């Protein structure tokens, strides 16, 4: 049980790190500070990757503990805790509750960050529409360098959507 407690504590700390990184990303999105968005996004991905690795380690550990206790290998952490005596049960349940709350907070932040990013893209589209003149029609005939009338060359466009 000590190994499980240690792993849950590590997982909770990594979940806190993910929440922190998502809050950083939200602050950058809200401030329209695009320079560092790629870095912040990479940091979120790294922290999330570490959390996923720890979740996998926990799943393996829980399956092993379940096997030792004669429980089904597909047992969840909550089901395993029902078979654990005190004081471990309370301590492990408390840690699992904290982890669950952090995961819910992270989900909410991901959704909020997505809305901020969408809003930023719409603002950029609107700005580009005000700054750049509309492209000429494809069939517009202009005078070219030679002094003769020529079809207008297609203009380059800025892609703001992936």
Give, region by region, the residue ranges found by the protein language model.
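Extended, charge-rich alpha-helical scaffolding segments
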Residues: 1-80
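Short terminal interaction segments
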Residues: 76-162
